Amino acid sequence: MLRLGGAGLVRGLRVVSPAWLRGPGGLPLALARTTGTSGARDRRAPASGTQRGRALSLSAAAVVNSAPRPLQPYLRLMRLDKPIGTWLLYLPCTWSIGLAADPGCFPDWYMLSLFGTGAILMRGAGCTINDMWDRDFDKKVERTANRPIAAGDISAFQSFVFLGAQLTLALGVLLHLNYYSIAMGAASLLLVVTYPLMKRVTFWPQLALGLTFNWGALLGWSAVKGSCDPAVCLPLYFSGVMWTLIYDTIYAHQDKKDDALIGLKSTALLFRENTKQWLSGFGVAMVGALSLVGASSGQTLPYYAAVAAVGAHLAHQIYTVDIHRAEDCWEKFTSNRTVGLLLFLGIVLGNLYKDKPDETKGVDAVGEESERTS
């Protein structure tokens, strides 16, 4: 047995570290940091000299952590380490693009990729605007105190320049669409800029977020078809807003104590112990609106099966969520990616199940008409 300066005891090849070198859960501090069990502040600590002991990970957080150090604060400002927000912004776009596809056909893959790129950029821009508005509040909330602007990793001027770069790239994506869609996309910028202020003036900032995050339900259809069909797009947009009210109210319960102390408002603080009743109402409204979308767009059995699965998933979320446990709220919040993907899959399969237009009938009709006139 060899003693190493009080730092640990070596028995064979095993190192036993003393308590002051141990992190959360009793893990050695270095291991705790690499496995993600340390606090949020450890994320900003310099990495140890070698990375050889770390397991290879392709998670979004691992990719951000492996980026050049000067870039990391900007990637975190865009929330690239937490891609769930990008998914929740992108999925309503996929629903709309899928519904706009011709019967018997897959969605337009070019549009899906274009909107995916736009979702990454606009979610990043939205987070940048949010953190610029909220930097003083973020410092007072435990969960947000280490965001790059609040922590001082990025200055106000740097964040403004970075915002301009993101919006410029997003404009480049938007210019690939038709004029109608360009105008619609530009109109959404007002919602993007004003949403972060809503938590200061109303208990319904989640409604403002829903109006913002589900704009793609309108834009996706118009990008494919050239304009919006109100019979399909409006109930689809409404269903997305109801969905956002569900998942973002659950999300807001993570910060309700801090929000109440610093004077910020949310539906979590408004609904309190009646949260599950409100969320149940939003869930019923969402499923009802999706059923109307199906009827208006001539959807088939796979679509309605997916709507039923969405309803079941939401019911499970609402019934089982513990609004007083931040960890459970986060878990339920992130599970909403599955909700969106289920619906998209149902739209695609429902559309493939439709009969393709019989082009030969049109050709035969033209031939018969020409014979009668000759």
UniProtKB/Swiss-Prot annotation:
Disulfide bonds, paired cysteine numbers: none
GO molecular function: 4-hydroxybenzoate polyprenyltransferase activity; prenyltransferase activity
Gene Ontology BP annotations: glycerol metabolic process; isoprenoid biosynthetic process; ubiquinone biosynthetic process
Segments in the Mitochondrial intermembrane topological domain: 105-108, 175-176, 222-230, 299-300, 354-374
Chief localisation class: mitochondrion
InterPro entries: HB_polyprenyltransferase-like, Prenyltransferase, UbiA_prenyltransferase, UbiA_prenylTrfase_CS, UbiA_sf
Cellular compartment(s): Mitochondrion inner membrane
Residue ranges that the Swiss-Prot or TrEMBL entry lists as coiled coil: none
UniProt entry tagged with the keyword Repeat: no
PROSITE patterns: UBIA
Mitochondrial matrix face residues: 64-83, 130-153, 198-200, 252-277, 322-332
Transit peptide: 1-63
Enzyme Commission number(s) from the entry: 2.5.1.39
Transmembrane intervals: 84-104, 109-129, 154-174, 177-197, 201-221, 231-251, 278-298, 301-321, 333-353
Family: Belongs to the UbiA prenyltransferase family.
UniProt-recorded name of the protein: 4-hydroxybenzoate polyprenyltransferase, mitochondrial
Originating organism: Rattus norvegicus
